[in-house]
Amino acid sequence: DDAELGQHGDGYTKQLAYYELDLGLNHVSRRWATSTLRSACCLAAIPGGADGPSGVLVGGEDYIEYLHEGMSPPSSSSSSSGTKNSKRLICAIPRRELHPKSKGVLITTISVLRQKKGKFFALAQSELGDVYKVTLQMSKEDKTVVTHMTICLLDTLPIGN
Protein backbone atom coordinates (compact mmCIF):
# COMPACT_ATOMS: atom_id res chain seq x y z
CA ASP A 1 0.00 0.00 0.00
CA ASP A 2 1.66 3.20 -1.20
CA ALA A 3 -0.17 5.34 1.38
CA GLU A 4 1.24 3.26 4.24
CA LEU A 5 4.80 3.32 2.87
CA GLY A 6 5.06 7.08 2.80
CA GLN A 7 3.38 7.95 -0.52
CA HIS A 8 0.74 10.64 -0.01
CA GLY A 9 -1.74 11.90 -2.58
CA ASP A 10 -0.05 15.31 -2.52
CA GLY A 11 3.30 13.85 -3.66
CA TYR A 12 4.85 13.97 -0.18
CA THR A 13 7.07 11.04 0.84
CA LYS A 14 8.51 10.61 4.34
CA GLN A 15 12.28 10.10 4.05
CA LEU A 16 14.97 8.76 6.36
CA ALA A 17 18.47 10.14 5.73
CA TYR A 18 21.51 8.38 7.21
CA TYR A 19 24.55 10.54 7.97
CA GLU A 20 28.03 9.39 8.96
CA LEU A 21 30.59 11.29 11.05
CA ASP A 22 34.23 10.93 10.01
CA LEU A 23 36.18 11.77 13.17
CA GLY A 24 39.50 11.88 11.31
CA LEU A 25 38.34 14.63 8.95
CA ASN A 26 35.82 16.16 11.38
CA HIS A 27 33.27 15.95 8.60
CA VAL A 28 29.64 14.76 8.33
CA SER A 29 28.50 13.17 5.07
CA ARG A 30 25.16 11.80 3.90
CA ARG A 31 25.48 8.03 3.31
CA TRP A 32 22.03 7.12 2.02
CA ALA A 33 18.34 8.02 2.14
CA THR A 34 15.17 6.02 1.61
CA SER A 35 11.43 6.42 2.04
CA THR A 36 9.89 4.96 5.17
CA LEU A 37 6.49 4.33 6.72
CA ARG A 38 4.18 7.35 6.77
CA SER A 39 3.59 7.04 10.53
CA ALA A 40 7.32 6.82 11.39
CA CYS A 41 8.03 8.91 14.48
CA CYS A 42 11.04 7.49 16.39
CA LEU A 43 14.47 6.11 15.51
CA ALA A 44 17.15 3.97 17.16
CA ALA A 45 20.64 3.30 15.77
CA ILE A 46 21.76 -0.34 15.51
CA PRO A 47 25.42 -1.00 16.42
CA GLY A 48 27.73 -1.48 13.44
CA GLY A 49 31.20 -2.78 12.69
CA ALA A 50 32.25 -5.67 14.94
CA ASP A 51 29.26 -5.04 17.25
CA GLY A 52 26.46 -5.67 14.76
CA PRO A 53 24.96 -5.16 11.30
CA SER A 54 24.40 -1.36 11.62
CA GLY A 55 21.26 0.34 10.36
CA VAL A 56 18.23 1.97 11.96
CA LEU A 57 15.06 0.79 13.69
CA VAL A 58 12.10 3.02 12.80
CA GLY A 59 9.01 2.96 15.02
CA GLY A 60 5.60 4.01 13.78
CA GLU A 61 1.93 3.10 13.98
CA ASP A 62 1.41 -0.70 14.13
CA TYR A 63 4.93 -1.47 12.77
CA ILE A 64 8.65 -1.40 13.50
CA GLU A 65 10.90 -1.31 10.46
CA TYR A 66 14.61 -2.17 10.10
CA LEU A 67 16.45 -0.11 7.48
CA HIS A 68 20.00 -0.55 6.17
CA GLU A 69 22.03 1.05 3.40
CA GLY A 70 21.78 -1.94 1.06
CA MET A 71 17.98 -2.29 1.22
CA SER A 72 15.66 -1.64 -1.67
CA PRO A 73 13.09 1.17 -1.48
CA PRO A 74 9.49 0.15 -0.67
CA SER A 75 8.16 1.01 -4.13
CA SER A 76 10.54 -1.31 -5.99
CA SER A 77 9.65 -4.88 -6.86
CA SER A 78 10.27 -7.69 -4.40
CA SER A 79 12.96 -9.28 -6.57
CA SER A 80 16.51 -9.21 -5.27
CA SER A 81 18.63 -6.34 -6.51
CA GLY A 82 21.94 -8.03 -5.80
CA THR A 83 22.67 -6.19 -2.57
CA LYS A 84 23.37 -8.12 0.58
CA ASN A 85 20.27 -6.74 2.40
CA SER A 86 17.83 -6.28 -0.47
CA LYS A 87 14.66 -7.20 1.47
CA ARG A 88 13.01 -4.62 3.75
CA LEU A 89 12.13 -5.91 7.23
CA ILE A 90 8.83 -4.62 8.59
CA CYS A 91 7.32 -6.36 11.62
CA ALA A 92 3.81 -5.83 13.01
CA ILE A 93 3.43 -4.89 16.67
CA PRO A 94 1.44 -7.38 18.81
CA ARG A 95 -1.97 -5.92 19.71
CA ARG A 96 -4.19 -6.28 22.76
CA GLU A 97 -7.36 -8.30 22.15
CA LEU A 98 -9.62 -5.50 23.41
CA HIS A 99 -7.83 -2.70 21.51
CA PRO A 100 -10.12 -1.32 18.77
CA LYS A 101 -9.06 -2.42 15.27
CA SER A 102 -9.71 1.09 13.95
CA LYS A 103 -7.07 2.62 16.25
CA GLY A 104 -3.41 1.87 15.66
CA VAL A 105 -0.70 1.23 18.25
CA LEU A 106 1.99 3.93 18.03
CA ILE A 107 5.57 3.19 19.08
CA THR A 108 6.87 6.28 20.91
CA THR A 109 10.27 5.16 22.24
CA ILE A 110 12.96 2.72 21.06
CA SER A 111 16.23 2.02 22.88
CA VAL A 112 18.98 -0.40 21.79
CA LEU A 113 20.77 -2.27 24.59
CA ARG A 114 24.06 -4.15 24.20
CA GLN A 115 24.61 -7.43 26.04
CA LYS A 116 28.07 -8.45 24.79
CA LYS A 117 30.18 -7.87 21.71
CA GLY A 118 27.94 -8.72 18.77
CA LYS A 119 24.85 -9.33 20.96
CA PHE A 120 22.14 -6.70 21.42
CA PHE A 121 18.39 -6.21 21.49
CA ALA A 122 15.99 -3.27 21.49
CA LEU A 123 13.18 -2.28 23.81
CA ALA A 124 10.26 -0.35 22.33
CA GLN A 125 7.34 1.25 24.18
CA SER A 126 3.93 2.10 22.78
CA GLU A 127 1.72 5.06 23.64
CA LEU A 128 -0.30 2.64 25.82
CA GLY A 129 2.74 1.76 27.97
CA ASP A 130 3.30 -1.71 26.50
CA VAL A 131 7.01 -2.62 26.35
CA TYR A 132 8.20 -4.88 23.52
CA LYS A 133 11.48 -6.71 23.00
CA VAL A 134 12.74 -6.40 19.41
CA THR A 135 15.28 -9.00 18.29
CA LEU A 136 17.18 -8.99 15.00
CA GLN A 137 18.46 -12.35 13.77
CA MET A 138 21.63 -12.29 11.69
CA SER A 139 22.70 -14.74 9.00
CA LYS A 140 24.96 -17.54 10.26
CA GLU A 141 27.38 -17.02 7.36
CA ASP A 142 27.59 -13.20 7.45
CA LYS A 143 26.92 -11.49 10.80
CA THR A 144 26.35 -8.15 9.02
CA VAL A 145 23.16 -9.38 7.27
CA VAL A 146 19.85 -9.29 9.17
CA THR A 147 17.50 -12.07 8.04
CA HIS A 148 14.57 -11.86 10.51
CA MET A 149 13.07 -9.53 13.08
CA THR A 150 10.81 -10.60 15.95
CA ILE A 151 8.78 -8.53 18.41
CA CYS A 152 7.32 -9.88 21.65
CA LEU A 153 5.40 -8.19 24.47
CA LEU A 154 7.36 -7.97 27.74
CA ASP A 155 5.28 -5.91 30.15
CA THR A 156 3.13 -2.81 30.59
CA LEU A 157 4.79 0.09 32.41
CA PRO A 158 4.06 3.79 32.92
CA ILE A 159 4.81 5.70 29.73
CA GLY A 160 8.44 6.88 29.42
CA ASN A 161 9.60 10.12 27.82
How should each PLM-predicted stretch be described?
Residues 1-161:
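Large eukaryotic, non-enzymatic subunits of multiprotein complexes that serve as scaffolds/tethers
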